[in-house]
Amino acid sequence: MNGVTGRMGYRQHLVRSILAIRDDGGLLLPDGSRVQLEPLLVGRNAAKLEEIATRHGVEHWTTDLDAALADPRWDVFADFAVTSARADALRKAIAAGKAIYTEKPTAETSAEALELAQLAAEAGVPNGVVHDKLYLPGLRKLRRLVDSGFFGRILSVRGEFGYWVFEGDWQSAQRPSWNYRKQDGGGIVVDMFPHWNYVLEQLFGRVESVYARTATHIEHRTDEQGTEYPATADDAAYGVFDLAGGITAQINSSWAVRVDRDELVEFQVDGTDGSAVVGLFGCRIQPRTATPKPVWNPDLKDERDYRGQWLEVPDNEVFGNGFRAQWEDFLQDLVAGRPHPYDLLSGARGVALAEAGLRSDAEGRRVDLPELQLPTQPTPRLQADSGSDSDSAASADNADSASAASDSASASPDVPEVVQHTETVGARA
């Protein structure tokens, strides 16, 4: 586990996922048996690693990533370290035959992200990318509605995400200052568009084009040391996404907006037979048979309680931590020898959407997204099979696919590549 001294790597991936599974007796398999997990903590700060290991009863930790990758005892390489070091670490892990589980973005450019997906496919290495939003209660309820045919023909999706992030002067900011410096990898497009890509494509359809406008609404902020600095990164993005099947989605993302909704992110889905308003936890529906019939009349105050005319979807099951839920799915897929659906290719599509959004803003037009495909897609193998299958894994030149993925950025030299800094500290290759 590379990068466990940072906030997300420690809290969500180590403590609430891997250690929680370990403390429950191991990974529960469909036949009722369990597979126990043993983590190896990797990072650059030996003192922090030792403190975490002691606190949680973890036996193994190291600051030597290369030695960890060379050790055959470890089957899975999980990366939560800085994005700038991720691609090199993933390449080494793939070459070592490790299964891959990684945070987003998987690389700094879509071409590099696609290259990683191709390398993993050629090596037959199982791989997964964190798609945590799909495992949250609200979106799982939405998935049930979509699968049940509740909406009829889905027409549109509207999303609102964000909240007011204080400037850091008279009140401290609740997000780190690097988020607002483009040169440090900040910006809401590179942060949120990869999330919107997997939410849209997994629930509604592939993103075929994007029109986006970005803004830096707050031009000066104050950092953690009390020093004012120019905000060079976008703090808001307004996107329109054309999806396969004729669905139109529009999502506003902003760190300069005040919240007047039930949750920090909400999606409204409208279809011919019904609509839903979904957050991270809640889900309210209005079927066609219970839809009111408003009449526009600006001369009279409308006394209807429109929000009160929606029905709350019950939980009907116990929802656990979303990060742990995906970890369990990934590990069960790994043990069973089947591909994980949220893989490095899916991660590359998220990076490509962020690049296309930045290009759309720079050029003031809609940008089409080519469908990313790998020239070869052999069946991923288990770590235990590495010795016999590696030589026979199919190999092909992926230059054409990588070129298609990077066209959205290369056509405009002023469009920045997607670079995302994280707070997580991990070992550099």
Whereabouts are the PLM-identified features?
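N-terminal Rossmann-like dinucleotide-binding module
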Residues: M1-H56, R428-A429
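Short acidic low-complexity segments
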Residues: P30, H60-P72
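Core-facing hydrophobic residues within beta-strands of well-ordered domains
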Residues: Q36-L37, W74, I154, V207
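Beta-strand-loop-alpha-helix segment that lines the small-molecule cofactor/substrate pocket
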Residues: D75-V76, V82-T83, A87-L134, G149
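Predominantly a Rossmann-like dinucleotide-binding segment in NAD(P)-dependent oxidoreductases
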Residues: K133-A231, G364
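Glycine-rich, aromatic-lined ligand/substrate-binding cores of catalytic
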Residues: V199-S209, T214-H217, E228-S275, F281
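C-terminal glycine/acidic-rich active-site capping loop/insertion
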Residues: T222-E224, Y229-P230, Y238, D242-L243, ...
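Intrinsically disordered, low-complexity terminal tails and inter-domain linkers enriched
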Residues: A384-T424
